[in-house]
Amino acid sequence: INTITFDAGNATINKYATFMESLRNEAKDPSLKCYGIPMLPNTNSTIKYLLVKLQGASLKTITLMLRRNNLYVMGYSDPYDNKCRYHIFNDIKGTEYSDVENTLCPSSNPRVAKPINYNGLYPTLEKKAGVTSRNEVQLGIQILSSDIGKISGQGSFTEKIEAKFLLVAIQMVSEAARFKYIENQVKTNFNRDFSPNDKVLDLEENWGKISTAIHNSKNGALPKPLELKNADGTKWIVLRVDEIKPDVGLLNYVNGTCQAT
């Protein structure tokens, strides 16, 4: 498994763009494309996981583990007390659990578990972060960098601090890889913190639906109008692939052939 690294403590817009490109290239199925948009592999791919190593200020690091077929964050590790400390969401079970444990922290090295006692779904993370919506949790390179420092190597931290970090990391890594619109929000607001707007939240919640609609399009027209949201929360009706294509970085895997590659 290749590790993609991003130094948030020493970042530029170009470095973030390169990180996004590397992540999409590692994740995508090289043989699948739909209307020019790369697609993630199905669950049978040989390489099932991806590692993303994030570095914050003063060389603190956290490594995220992603499921390759949907970019879902399964857990993370950090160096703690000269050991590899791994943190796995409580909805990861069975063989996947041991895969995450052994990939984040190979058994040849001393390791210690610090479980995440909740799942990785947005409503859960929002509740643990003490917010009613994740639009209350600001995103930004500086925030990502300082959040890494609040967890990496620390003897203790609250669930609130952890959930906030996870909300920031999931959106700035996985969601930004899925959606160029979200990547561009990070780039536009690069030197300041920002709240994710209504379009960001809506895209995040409709990635599967958007992927299926694009995949099932005929001659560039969606099977039926897709009702999404603009940045200001107003209704955005999408009729054609071209209208949403600039916002999409990766499609979720959809079975069957796509009319246009």
Curated annotation (Swiss-Prot):
Disulfide bonds: C34-C258, C84-C105
Record's function text: Inhibits viral infection of plants, and protein synthesis in vitro.
Enzyme Commission number(s) from the entry: 3.2.2.22
Keywords for the protein's UniProt record, in alphabetical order: Antiviral defense, Disulfide bond, Hydrolase, Plant defense, Protein synthesis inhibitor, Toxin
Protein's organism: Phytolacca americana (American pokeweed)
UniProt keyword Disulfide bond present: yes
Gene Ontology MF, one: toxin activity
Lineage: Eukaryota, Viridiplantae, Streptophyta, Embryophyta, Tracheophyta
Protein name: Antiviral protein S
A single BP term in Gene Ontology: defense response to virus
